[in-house]
Amino acid sequence: MRKDLTIALPEGYETGTSRHALLLTLDPRLPASEIAGRLRAEGVLPPMIVAVRAEGSTAEASELITHLIFTYRILEASEARWMCGTGHSAAEALRLVLNRPDLAGRAACLSTSFEGAEGAPPLHSRLLRELEERTELPSGVKLFLDYGTIGLDECYEPYHRDVGAILRAKGWKDDREFRITRAAGGSHDPASWQNRLGPGLRWLAGR
């Protein structure tokens, strides 16, 4: 499992005994440690253990978080365990928070690929169907979702419109459990995502 992760520990971790919040990044192209460090310096985020899934790793998010919990001093409250992802890994992060809120309670989902590997339109999106079929949504979790307006991301607006309607119909409220943001000028690429991760983490932190 070690080969599947790159770990950045907060200052003083190795000589201390306190537990810390966790940020697990499922896309190694996101400079999550740098962005989290900047937000920490601004007082937005607490000191966090930042773990990045290695490129090419086939380990699932649930496996990685379970390993991290048993290996590092991570806070027990699930709201202190965050995830972020892009495209298909954003869909993975969203699923984990909804299906295993005991493992992770926050997720920043950038350019979520609701169409899946099969490229399904909104009406046939497997992830949207899963959401519609749920009898209830977990409480105490928060999801940040965004999509751009250029290239592939331009096609994501109807998916996000539908997911917003589903979440509201099941009792969630905008800016309480979730936020959906249309990132003007945003696109489906790492340069755009790294500019959008900060605002996502800031919202998850309540700032």
Give the positions of each predicted feature.
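Non-catalytic cap/lid and distal C-terminal segments of serine-dependent acyl enzymes
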Residues: 1-207
